[in-house]
Design a protein with these regions (language model features):
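Hydrophobic alpha-helical membrane-insertion segments, chiefly the h-region
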Residues: 46-55
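Sec/Tat-exported extracytoplasmic proteins
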Residues: 90, 98, 117-120, 146-150, ...
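Functionally critical loop-and-helix segments that line ligand-binding/catalytic clefts
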Residues: 2-6, 10, 16-18, 22-24, ...
Length: 281
């Protein structure tokens, strides 16, 4: 998920470069015949780095494929989506960016909301939380934007580090403001909100808090492992997904559990009997 100003988050593996070799002590100038060895060493290091990256990516994909219930999330960054080209049988849930901070509204939200629902998708909305804005204002922005529908997924609050809002609140103050928004959305929509977050943000800010709030974890290097080992509900395993009908790369997600677990989750939200794309019980 992304803010209105920042590009999408990608974890990148740092690889060594040839520059470190040239920075070593220059006791003597190597002869021309030694240069091919430096080039060869650089090539070997590059191949090793690419191999490690490929290993992590392949294992991450294989791990995500263990979960049968798949979905994706989008915002205006994905442009004009051809919803009729995407199967609600293949992707069981979709989350749309609705709002950010106290006043930003995603310009594609209403269009995506209407068209995705028309195609039979189970749809929910998320809010990108600004750490330097108070929870009440942000909750109001979301409530004014996202319709209250009995067949929509629970609201999501996207919690991650924000370089424009450093040291505005202490951890205790921040948790208090997050609690305000959480409670406002719970009261308005009648559904327990979900927290989308990174491993780093959870381990530093959210650990041991909001224990009844479902977690949606962004982790691109393997299955999420959080401090205290809380159970996660959704896992965003890549931001480099490709779906026919979406003109850009897209975030892909899975639900933790089987098809039957998914049905149970939907039943708890009062959603099971409504959409036509649900699995047969």
């Amino acid at each position: 998920m992304v803010s209105s100003t920042n590009s999408s988050y990608d974890d990148e593996l740092k690889t060594n470069t040839c520059k470190s070799m040239s920075a070593r002590k220059k006791v003597s100038t190597p002869s021309k015949t030694s240069y091919p060895y430096y080039i060869l060493a650089c090539v070997v290091m590059l191949c090793v780095g690419l191999g490690i990256t490929y290993f992590f990516l392949q294992n991450n994909v294989a791990s995500a494929q263990e979960y049968p219930v798949k979905g994706f999330d989008v915002s205006h960054h994905q442009g004009d989506i051809q919803w009729q080209s995407i199967s609600p049988q293949e992707f069981k849930f979709v989350y749309l960016k609705a709002t950010e901070g106290g006043d930003f509204k995603d310009r594609k939200f209403q269009d995506n909301w209407l068209k995705a629902r028309e195609q039979g998708f189970l749809v929910g909305a998320y809010h990108f939380y600004r750490l330097c804005r108070d929870g009440q204002i942000q909750a109001q922005n979301f409530i004014e934007t996202v319709p209250k529908k009995t067949d929509s997924l629970p609201p999501v609050i996207d919690l991650e580090y924000d370089s424009t809002c450093i040291n505005t609140y202490t951890r205790e103050q921040l948790l208090k403001e997050i609690q305000v928004m959480h409670d406002q959305l719970y009261q308005h929509y009648g559904l327990q909100p979900i927290f989308y977050t990174s491993k780093a943000f959870y381990n530093i800010v959210l650990v041991d808090e909001f224990k009844k709030t479902p977690l949606w974890i962004r982790e691109y290097q393997g299955q999420p492992e959080l401090k205290g080992n809380p159970k996660w509900t959704f896992w965003q395993h890549t931001s480099q997904g490709q779906i026919k009908g979406i003109p850009t790369l897209v975030d892909l997600n899975v639900f933790q559990g089987s098809e039957q677990d998914w049905i149970s989750f939907l039943e708890r939200q009062g959603l099971y009997q409504l959409p036509q794309n649900l699995p047969i019980k």
